[in-house]
Regions:
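Histidine/acidic residue-rich metal-binding segments in metalloenzymes
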Residues: 42-50, 67-72, 78, 98-113, ...
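Mid-to-C-terminal alpha-helical segments outside catalytic/metal-binding sites
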Residues: 264-299
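An N-terminally biased module of ancient metal coordination in phosphate/nucleic-acid-related enzymes
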Residues: 17-80
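Active-site environment of divalent metal-dependent phosphoester hydrolases
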Residues: 32-34, 64-68, 89-92, 121-124, ...
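Short acidic/histidine-rich active-site segments
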Residues: 216, 246-263
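Glycine-rich phosphate-binding "P-loop"
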Residues: 27-36, 119-142
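Hydrophobic faces of well-ordered beta-strands that scaffold small-molecule active sites
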Residues: 23-29, 57-59, 83-86, 112-116, ...
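Bacterial N-terminal signal peptides
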Residues: 4-16
Length: 299
């Protein structure tokens, strides 16, 4: 498979990775400790990022906030900026303003992002992964009051919004409500694959409303038995990026699963695919350095 050969190239040409990945920010990093299997620890991911001169990693966990982990690993591994987030799944109380408040107040101030529900989202339950204990964000075309409360807490702490596994319609509602509260740093979480499955016209609309759209390497890997509907070919991914416009895009890995490439290898392979498709160095810089930095509130 092409992605395996790219990972192999990364081992054959170690000098190429620092040059390609210097200053890159990955906004979707899975790692251990976690309640599910991971191929790499957060400490290992940070050390590899330092080796390749990356700027920052955003640590993601579907079931607990990662601001504490980001702070602890930062104490152990200098030379890399690490940030944490919270995903509003059932394990943190679902749409829970108090959980967001505590994440924002965690030592170090490294909690930067709130994901709306992911694996526990109502949209995921109805379209991809049945889960009767789902977490709703909207009813009858309107965001729930507790979602608006979360957005208010986010605005007061200067946090960034990721739409999680919300439906396309819910994502647009979230963007509109967030912008109304002065939350300008918004990412539509991997809009292409299930369970989000946002069509290209809606992706363009989200961009026009002021959101960035995330395209991830993980989805381009060969479909597996656990998540076959998440597969989106690299060709289709590149077409969507071009249609939406690199100025409206962030590129991430969403890696850390056993059997998949590690984060740096996936990003390196994504860069090679972008270059092969005619994307310029300036466009790649925008998608992998400038826009991710803006989303995290970095200068």
């Amino acid at each position: 498979m092409w992605f395996r050969s790219f990972a192999f190239v990364c081992f054959l040409m170690p000098a190429a990775l620092p040059a390609q990945l210097e200053g890159v920010i990955d906004l979707h990093v899975h790692s251990a400790p976690d309640s599910g299997p991971r191929s790499i620890t957060a400490v290992e991911a940070a050390r590899i990022a330092v080796r390749y001169k990356m700027r920052a990693l955003l640590l993601k966990n579907h079931y607990t906030h990662t601001a504490s982990l980001a702070y602890t690993v930062s104490e152990v591994v200098p030379g890399i900026e690490l940030y944490g987030a919270i995903a509003l799944n059932r394990s943190v109380g679902g749409i829970n303003p108090t959980a967001v408040e505590h994440m924002a107040r965690t030592t170090g101030g490294l909690g930067r992002v709130v994901w709306m529900p992911t694996f526990d989202s109502e949209h995921s339950h109805r379209t991809a992964n049945p889960n009767p204990l789902f977490v709703s964000v909207a009813k009858d075309g309107k965001l729930l009051p507790e979602v608006l409360q979360v957005l208010d807490v986010m605005a007061s702490h200067g946090l960034s919004l990721a739409t999680g596994h919300s439906s396309p319609a819910e994502s647009l509602l979230l963007i509109e409500a967030a912008k109304a509260r002065g939350i300008d740093r918004i990412v539509v979480t991997h809009p292409q694959p299930d369970p989000v499955a946002m069509d290209i016209e809606t992706q363009k609309k989200a961009a026009a409303m002021g959101a960035l759209l995330e395209y991830k390497f993980n989805s381009t890997l060969a479909p597996n038995s656990a998540w076959p509907s998440e597969f989106v070919s690299m060709s289709d991914t590149l077409k969507s990026i071009r249609a939406v416009g690199p100025e409206n895009v962030v590129v991430s890995s969403d890696l850390g699963q056993p059997g998949n490439p590690i984060h740096a290898d996936g990003l390196f392979a994504f860069i090679q695919a972008l270059k092969s498709a005619g994307f310029t160095e300036s466009e790649i810089n925008t998608m992998m350095r400038i826009n991710p930095a803006k989303f995290l509130g970095l200068k």
